[in-house]
Amino acid sequence: MNIAKLIDHTILKPNSTKEDVMKVIEEAKQYKFASVCINPTWVKLAAEELAGHDVDVCTVIGFPLGASTTETKAFETKDAIAKGATEVDMVINVGALKDGDNEFVEKDIYEVVQAAKGKALVKVIIETCLLTDEEKVRACELSVKAGADFVKTSTGFSTGGATAEDIALMRKTVGPNVGVKASGGVRTREDADKMVEAGASRVGASASVAIVLNDAKGATDNY
């Protein structure tokens, strides 16, 4: 298995400098990761640097809390795509999901899907560590209904990250035709393999190089 092609090589720390981001971009070129996942401010740079390389430009929307308005998320999506993003990872409105406001949650996702239609993949971060199993299932069902391409476990900025159990539950819920992304706490090749075995079709990690080289010593998970 070519694990590199399943990895979104991630740098989302708020204090990331241009030098930090360029390092991630160069590593993505070298190891041929599926994408670089960066904050929106770096999308234009990444798109320019990765032109001609088989590496997608992924960014985050409504990140990390998911509590911005639907209109803001849709605008962020259009703006990111205009600057060169080919994948967007949006955060659901977790509070609305917990309130049982399915209509709001679905519309929130749907508007981002529409803003990205035909131009970028949409991954929906459900923030599993804050949800009950019933809420995880509902979040996945609403994501599929809204037309998302992927569901994703975590931002990496909350109380926990991906678990194999959550990946299995999400895969069971969305079926074979929607992607499942494991992110948060995936630091080693063993971690990544466990997620893929449980049903993940993509892995988000900042320790991507260590995962590919199978080097536990080099692994950190500082998004």
From Swiss-Prot:
Where's it found, cell-wise?
Answer: Cytoplasm
Q: Write out the function statement from the record.
A: Catalyzes a reversible aldol reaction between acetaldehyde and D-glyceraldehyde 3-phosphate to generate 2-deoxy-D-ribose 5-phosphate.
Its organism's taxonomic lineage begins at: Bacteria, Bacillati, Bacillota, Bacilli, Bacillales
Might you name a Gene Ontology BP term for this protein?
deoxyribonucleotide catabolic process
Which molecular function terms from Gene Ontology are attached? deoxyribose-phosphate aldolase activity
Name the chemical reaction catalysed here. Answer: 2-deoxy-D-ribose 5-phosphate = D-glyceraldehyde 3-phosphate + acetaldehyde
Gene source species? Bacillus mycoides (strain KBAB4)
- Pathway note: Carbohydrate degradation; 2-deoxy-D-ribose 1-phosphate degradation; D-glyceraldehyde 3-phosphate and acetaldehyde from 2-deoxy-alpha-D-ribose 1-phosphate: step 2/2
Recorded name of the encoding gene: deoC
The entry's protein name is Deoxyribose-phosphate aldolase
Q: Which UniProt keywords apply?
A: Cytoplasm, Lyase, Schiff base
Q: Which family is it part of?
A: Belongs to the DeoC/FbaB aldolase family. DeoC type 1 subfamily.
EC number(s) per entry: 4.1.2.4
